[in-house]
Amino acid sequence: MASKRRNMSCSERHQKLVDENYCKKLHVQALKNINSQIRNRMVQNENDNRVERKQFLRLLQNEQFELDMEEAIQKAEENKRLKELLLKQEEKLAMELAKLKHESLKDEKMRQQVRENSIELRELEKKLKAAYMNKERAAQIAEKDAIKYEQMKRDAEIAKTMMEEHKRIIKEENAAEDKRNKVKAQYYLDLEKQLEEQEKKKQEAYEQLLKEKLMIDEIVRKIYEEDRLEKQQKLEKMNAMRRYIEEFQKEQALWRKKKREEMEEENRKIIEFANMQQQREEDRMAKVQENEEKRLQLQNALTQKLEEMLRQREDLEQVQQELYQEEQAEIYKRKLKEEAEKKLRKQKEMKQDFEEQMALKELVLQAAKEEEENFRKTMLAKFAEDDRIELMNAQKQRMKQLEHRRAVEKLIEERRQQFLADKQQELEEWQLQQRRQGFINAIIEEERLKLLKEHATNLLGYLPKGVFKKEDDIDLLGEEFRKVYQQRSEICEDK
């Protein structure tokens, strides 16, 4: 504020100087105007007033020169003063900055010392380090589980690929088998067709034979009718022909029987082939069903193994969480017990210190009283000895004793005042120590909150108990952190 006021004063002085210069310039301008008017008049009266004009012009020039010199001197002085003022302000600003920097370094050094010597901050740092270790351990466990899961996933994919490859091979084999069956069926169809054509040809040959027989019968009849005379010869010939026909019929019957047996054998083979194909199809279906059952069993085994591994991992995590909670609860109980013992011990020490201080105070007061009494007696005796009270009359003796008593009381009062001053100084030193301790406690609290703000968000879910001293610590870290922390706390309580 003072610097601002000084800056305003400097600005006002500068403005005042500018105004003065402006007035001087106006004055100079007025003089110049007058000079111009005079010059005009002198032009009119040049012949009459030439000498006076030269003198007046010289006077004006001298005055103008003096004004210019004065203005230049004032400007130089003002600039010098402004430079000195600016230099002083810069020096003062540099001193203030150095002081602020020194105070900042001093405060930082004190905070560093407090951080190094504070048991609470060291405990908090240990807890945060433990939380980071827990987080790292959880990350390693999660990474191992992820690797196991990826391995199981790869195994499942490999098994799935093998099953698909097996299915594809079975499908290709079935397709090849179907193709072979179709080829065989087509072959048997072609064979049956050929047999039918052969049978048809045989039937045509038989019909042709019958036609020839009819023709022969017709010829025989004609011969019988035309030549009865040669009946005997032709009859023999006819008998021979009949025998030939009978033999031909017998051979044809044998051929038909043979063909029928061949057809029956062929049909039997076809039936056997069909039965064999049916048996193969049944075997193939049984093999496919068996492979499908094996695949389902393998898939179920993999699923059960995966579920078992997941269940074991969950059980392991639950056991680890329970062990961690039990360990943290044990640490918290032990810490509470230690804090209670420490508090009780501190109370006992404070009580003992108070009793010792009271006893010491009593001793000091008693000693002070005894010392005052001894001092009073000594001083009275000394004064009595010095003034030889026995040589004085009673009135002077009483006056002298009263004077001695007053002097002794004055000395006692001075000693009492000195004692009170010493106690007041001790009280002030104790209050100063308390204020210093309060400042240190404030620094510890600030550093504790700073550590929490810096690390608590990254360690959410891994912070041990006892990190937060009060509910306000959680609220300082933000609404989102508080909600997630409460949810995790509820989950841990439910477990």
Curated annotation (Swiss-Prot):
Signal peptide: none annotated. Belongs to the MNS1 family. GO terms for cellular component: axonemal A tubule inner sheath; axonemal microtubule; axoneme; nucleus; sperm flagellum. Able to form oligomers. Microtubule inner protein component of sperm flagellar doublet microtubules. Interacts with ODAD1. Interacts with BBOF1. Microtubule inner protein (MIP) part of the dynein-decorated doublet microtubules (DMTs) in cilia axoneme, which is required for motile cilia beating. May play a role in the control of meiotic division and germ cell differentiation through regulation of pairing and recombination during meiosis. Required for sperm flagella assembly. May play a role in the assembly and function of the outer dynein arm-docking complex (ODA-DC). ODA-DC mediates outer dynein arms (ODA) binding onto the axonemal doublet microtubules. It comes from Macaca fascicularis. Keywords: Cell projection, Cilium, Coiled coil, Cytoplasm, Cytoskeleton, Flagellum, Meiosis, Nucleus, Phosphoprotein. Pfam families: TPH. This is Meiosis-specific nuclear structural protein 1. It is found in: Nucleus; Cytoplasm, Cytoskeleton, Cilium axoneme; Cytoplasm, Cytoskeleton, Flagellum axoneme. The lineage of its organism: Eukaryota, Metazoa, Chordata, Craniata, Vertebrata. GO terms for biological process: cilium organization; flagellated sperm motility; meiotic cell cycle. It comes from the Eukaryota.
